[in-house]
Every structure is written in C-alpha cells, then in structure tokens.
Amino acid sequence: YDKKTITIKEYCIFEILCILIPLAKITNIFIAGLNLLLPMENVEKKKRLLIKWGALAVVIIVGGGYYLYTTKFSVNMEQYAYLKAMHVNSTKQMEYILNHTSKWGRAFVLCLINQFSNTLGMLSSFGWLDYGYPIIGVIGTVGFAKVCFQEGSIELKKMDRFLISLMGVGIYTFSCLALYLSWTTVKSKEISGMQGRYLIPMILLLSMLGGIGDSKKNKENYVVDITISVVM
C-alpha cells in the first residue's frame, strides 16, 4: 500500500480480517470499527463513507449471524454441570434485567468498576486460572510497546481517539454482559467467568491512544499498527 493511503482492494483485505474477529469471539466485534480510521484519501468522501460503513455493516451481520448459529450448539457435560450447580439460566437472567433495569444497571456498572483491577491481574493466566500462560502477558506488552512507543509519529484526531476509547469500553462492557447472561447466577451482584485474556484486544486498542506526532508523515506505520491490533 501507499504511504499516504490504501486502495479499495487493500481495504477489502483488511475487512476480511475484521470479519474473522467476531467469528473468534463476538464481543470483540468492536475492533472492526478500526476500519473507519483507515486513510482512503484517493476515494471520494461520499463513496469512502459508504464503503466504510457498508463494510462495518457486513461484519456486524456476519458476526451476529454466526453467533446466533452457535447458540444452537449443545453445551458439553462439564459446562452443563457448572451451569446447573450455579443456577445459571440466561432466559431468567434476561427477564430479571428487563424487569429491574434501573436496579440492575447501577449494580452492573459498580461491578464493572470493582472487578476491572482483578481482571487485569488475570492477563498472564489461561482458562480458570488453573494454568499459567505467561505468553499472554508478553503478547500484550509487545503490542502495547509497538503501538505506543515505537511509532512516535502517529497522531490521532480527537474524534478518532474518542472512537477508539468507545471500542475499548464496548469490548469490556459487552464481555461482562455476555458472561453475566451465560455464566452468572440469576440476580447475582457479581460477574462470573471473567478472564484477563478477554481484555487483550481492549488493551491493544487503548494503547493506540498513546501515539503522538504528525500522522501525515507516517501513515504507513499507522496502518500497520491498526492491522496488528486486529490480528492480535
């Protein structure tokens, strides 16, 4: 790709990566929003917006459709035993949320804040904290260092920074919401099943906010950083 912009063909290749994201984990679908930040100055503004938002819609439709398909899969015996022992019922949990939205909302927000630090401490563990997996922490550290410190010539606009922040918050919030529905006891004030590795995409996204400098001088590396975040 050119240092100043990318072609529609190259943009489509990037979108294929974005489509793979929700197929791996639906809550990371927010990362696909990075396509809105890619430089396409050689394309008319109206057409550029149409392509970007259209591609984003495709990612959401494909990811959402695949997620609905996977909900038809039966859980294994180990999961079933846990769900039964912990009185987990997604249908009743949703009914509780809808019937006590205000009460649940306050408790959920407080839970998001209180459990965040504990979740970060799990970044070097895999599964239910039974297996040490230090490489996860290494991946996060390398990604953070690459985006934040190596590329000193990247400067995002205020709106771009705001969008990236929303993507990060969205990943964390919807990961917790998904676990609250599928792994947490009905009416519980805590979220069960959260693992630090779920936050690696969020940390990589937020690390992009640390870049400073003139983005016009180094847009090639800017595209590389966005692609690295998507792949990882």
Model-predicted segments: where are they?
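Transmembrane helix-loop junctions and nearby membrane-interface residues
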Residues: M40-V43, T71, C176-W183, G211, ...
